[in-house]
Amino acid sequence: YAIDMGPWSFIHGEAAREGGEDCLVSARGLKTPRAGLSISMGNPHTVVMLGSDGKLDGLDLHSLPQVNPAPVNGTNVEFVVPVDLDVESGAQVGAIRMRVHERGVGETLSCGTGACAAAAATRFWGGEEAPDEWLVHVPGGTLAVTFVLGPDDLEHVVLAGPAQMVATVVLR
């Protein structure tokens, strides 16, 4: 299943584009604050790149990460680590592992808009050579994220992944 999630954008505009970061993020399990990049997918996200799986796995995301400056209405915070891929077809595909703290909820197993924001930030950091297709590995499974030109001439994000019927409900 796939859906066009719409265009992505920088929350802090040109300053984020020029510097590649727009805030500092503190979280339990990190010794020092890390640079983050705030991305809008229609809702706010702040993405932080970490250097190793150990750092990602060592985070305690039961507590709200602190973002300074934070977007006005708060933000979901995604922590990512790059993943090496062996792609036999020769197609260029990026891959990251992600964990997310969703505002008002805490850590969740997956977040569709978060996966899109994380791929957008990682792709931005990768520069012009970064791929348009990404695999985002979250605790709940793997999602595919693709960047395409939308009908409005903006860059849109297409999210794809498995779907499973979990209940049938009859309302009366």
Residue ranges and their predicted role:
Residues 1-110, 119-172:
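Active-site proximal loop and beta-alpha junction motif in alpha/beta enzyme cores
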